[in-house]
């Protein structure tokens, strides 16, 4: 600045900047100390400590008239309630496999009736026999609790107890021996079960003389189980896990009609035909014979004799070679 009346060239920016101004405090008397404010106690007029103590004692001694607000157990019961188990439909092969594998949790999730629990395979074995033979103690205990028949035997006359003793599973033997068995009523129960008629849904017949356990292992029942395959490709041993089969089913194939989008394709393979030797055009040929022989066709087992060919010696081969040389020489002479 040249003079006191002139302003700073950047006076506008200095006036608009948000500067914090310093405030100066004048010095005071050093001997003077300000008194700190004391905490003021709130006092209630007309009430002393003894009266207040007596009042609180009366309040505490008075009986309560309202019930305390306890947490409701209904809500906790709803929160702790386990979700309902979804039962899986009964599958005989899966039921036997789970019993031998000692998987009790999966067994309990399967919907099985009393007949399903006592079902047998083609050898007359029940799930209890299989579990006892494999030493599946938990599965045996679960089946016994469900009320399976312990004294049933297979076609060879072996019970679950005998199979466990033969395999050396002492835990299973002790479990089966500790069960209370009524020997007197066993014969009566067998006679009653044998006389009860039943209807087999697989065989579509009513049975009166044969009991249900024996009918399960009969040849007629086992044959009818395999009479109706799941689909037509079952006879070709194509598994349901086959990727090609899964793709066709996913695209809408019903596993019954022909192949292709229009379901008009050939389902079964083309029959093979024996190849015939073709001698030339215009010559009649025999009808092609299908390689699949019919029933009671003796040609299927007929032994065909091989064509006889005479044995050639070295002299015969030399003689044939000379004959061919003479024939070639004669043709050259004629053509020249």
UniProtKB/Swiss-Prot annotation:
<dbReference type="InterPro" id="IPR036770">
    <property type="entry name" value="Ankyrin_rpt-contain_sf"/>
</dbReference>
<dbReference type="InterPro" id="IPR000467">
    <property type="entry name" value="G_patch_dom"/>
</dbReference>
<dbReference type="Pfam" id="PF12796">
    <property type="entry name" value="Ank_2"/>
</dbReference>
<feature type="repeat" description="ANK 2">
    <location>
        <begin position="156"/>
        <end position="185"/>
    </location>
</feature>
<feature type="domain" description="G-patch">
    <location>
        <begin position="240"/>
        <end position="286"/>
    </location>
</feature>
<keyword id="KW-0677">Repeat</keyword>
<dbReference type="Pfam" id="PF01585">
    <property type="entry name" value="G-patch"/>
</dbReference>
<dbReference type="InterPro" id="IPR039146">
    <property type="entry name" value="GPANK1"/>
</dbReference>
<dbReference type="GO" id="GO:0003676">
    <property type="term" value="F:nucleic acid binding"/>
</dbReference>
<keyword id="KW-0040">ANK repeat</keyword>
<feature type="repeat" description="ANK 1">
    <location>
        <begin position="123"/>
        <end position="152"/>
    </location>
</feature>
<protein>
    <recommendedName>
        <fullName>G patch domain and ankyrin repeat-containing protein 1 homolog</fullName>
    </recommendedName>
</protein>
<dbReference type="InterPro" id="IPR002110">
    <property type="entry name" value="Ankyrin_rpt"/>
</dbReference>
